[in-house]
């Protein structure tokens, strides 16, 4: 499930702060043995750190896509796929897009093969 509903994001940010927008959604919807894909170019995004912390408390696995080695998010993820590329965040995001396509293809093969 993509956490991208503008109404949810706006209401949650307004009521609880932007730091909690993703963790509140996961809290309401995820269960143990689910998997969260956390994507952050810097690896320092507070809202992504919060959702990773929540997942760790609840036994929810986290795969992170980051752009900096040893970032806070990479340290609290079960698996970090890091694409360090200096100060070029656009390159990191392009690589993340490719990785997401590969992950989707792998999941589809596993589910529908």
Regions found by a protein language model. Give the residues of each.
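Glycine-rich phosphate-binding loops that contact phosphosugars or nucleotide phosphates
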Residues: 1-113
């Amino acid at each position: 499930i993509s956490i991208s509903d503008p109404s949810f994001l706006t209401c949650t940010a307004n009521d609880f702060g932007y730091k909690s927008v993703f963790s509140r959604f996961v809290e309401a919807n995820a269960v143990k043995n689910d998997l969260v894909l956390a994507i952050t170019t810097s690896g320092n995004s507070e809202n992504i750190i919060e959702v990773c912390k929540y997942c760790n408390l609840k036994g929810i696995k986290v795969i992170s896509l980051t752009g900096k080695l040893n970032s806070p998010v990479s340290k609290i993820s079960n698996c970090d796929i890091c694409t360090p590329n200096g100060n070029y965040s656009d390159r990191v995001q392009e690589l993340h897009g490719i990785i997401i396509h590969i992950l989707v293809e792998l999941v589809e093969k596993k589910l529908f093969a």
